[in-house]
Amino acid sequence: MSVLQTPEKGPVIHDWRPEDPAFWGRSGKQTARRNLWISIPALLLAFAVWMVWSTVIVRLNAIGFSFSTDQLFWLAALPGLSGATLRIFYSFMVPIFGGRRWTALSTASLLIPALWMGFAVQNPSTPYNVFVLIALLCGFGGGNFASSMSNISFFYPKSQQGTALGLNAGLGNLGVSVMQFCVPLVISFGVFGFMGGQPQVLADGSSLWLQNAGFIWVPFILAVTVIAWFGMNDLSSARASFSEQAVIFKRKHNWLMCWLYLATFGSFIGFSAAFPLLIKTSFPEVIALKFAFLGPLVGALVRPLGGWLADKLGGAKVTLWNFVLMIVMVFGVLHFLPKGGEGGSFYGFLGMFMLLFITTGVGNGSTFRMIPVIFRTLHEKSALGRKPEQREQALKNAGKESAAVLGFSSAIGAFGAFFIPKSFGTSMALTGGPEMAFYMFVGFYLSCIVVTWWWYARKGAATPC
């Protein structure tokens, strides 16, 4: 198989000028699109493997295991902990190794937890500690997001980064809903025949192939790994050592945007991880897996809308009002929850949670759009009155710092995949319900409104965006 060629006839591109309209129209746009549309399925698979435990835990006890509700919430939360931690390192990998190489290698790493899970669930004597380790390894999928977003940011001009990053993240985020929709289907029959192992027999006499929750992703992981290796590009202009990228830790706006992204993406991925078990514990009469995929689906689909709105209206304005709506939706969810195990309305709860997922998706897109604008503005100000070559270097530095911040903030945001499921588990253990956790989220969103308004949205803000 031959490498898909660029105008430079190779996988490494040495001349990359997306801000040059002539270059962009001649060859840049086509190359950027190709890398984006290979990146998207790779990221979709990463999210599917990362969040697969959110579905598996709902059925584990039905096939012979005896784990407590708190233990099950831990299995849902642990991929978030490991994935978020890996993102811290993955966010610096693309400038060191190249986007093509790293996308292929990180996608291939998903084979480890996918295969191991498939074998482990077939043995009812598999200890809980083994499942803990597999759940942690599923964090490989969570780590991929940071490097993917960093990589795509290098390919697009500033004016189109919001839409491009929104598409990459939004369609990649669909991996959660695709997984939560497909897994209940594929575990209901022997997809792989004798190669997939024997079914587990449930108490009512029906059969379940829970191993398919892991095995189903293997052929797709292999295919996308090959496509990424031969179809994507490495940009030499995006190369930077860790020390060059580490300057972001001195940037105030890096930490501010990490705080905001923890509220938007952290909420999206945390609610996605906890939603199936939250439905099951709050509304036991409802078949959770019939509805669980809907929240991540709408949240992922509207993420590009958040980037587009930020391009048109300004990222800070969209983000500010989005946080206000998130608070309103949380109170709506609380209104429809059962009180003391009685009352409540599942469909009211579901509707308000869908609206909450929509706001997390819009916020994901708008906050990510803010980052490149903020750092380009800062570097443009620093280069005022300087020589043309110094201004050009300032723009390159802005691009590298933006990419590093995109990756690092996504790492911090991913901790929501750990904290939100664990918050629900702790709230239920202490109070018998999830309400305490929701009130904590409201307090956090209020702090984000203050940060967004003061530094980015108010009249006279130092860095409007």
Model-derived regions, located:
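Cytosolic juxtamembrane N-terminal segment immediately preceding the first transmembrane helix
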Residues: M1-A48
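Extracytoplasmic gate region of multi-pass secondary transporters
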Residues: W50-V58, R251-A300, P304, N364, ...
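Central cavity-lining transmembrane alpha-helices of secondary-active solute carriers
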Residues: W74-F92, F293-G306
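Conserved MFS/SLC helix-loop-helix module at the cytosolic interface between two early adjacent transmembrane helices
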Residues: T85-Y128
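C-terminal ends and interior cores of transmembrane alpha-helices
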Residues: A108-P124, V324-E342
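Hydrophobic core of transmembrane alpha-helices in multi-pass small-molecule transporters
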Residues: P127-G143, G344-N364
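Glycine-rich segments within core transmembrane alpha-helices of 12-TM secondary carriers
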Residues: G142, G162-V191, L406-I420
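C-terminal membrane-cytosol helix-exit motif in multi-pass small-molecule transporters
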Residues: S188, I216-A238, V451-W455
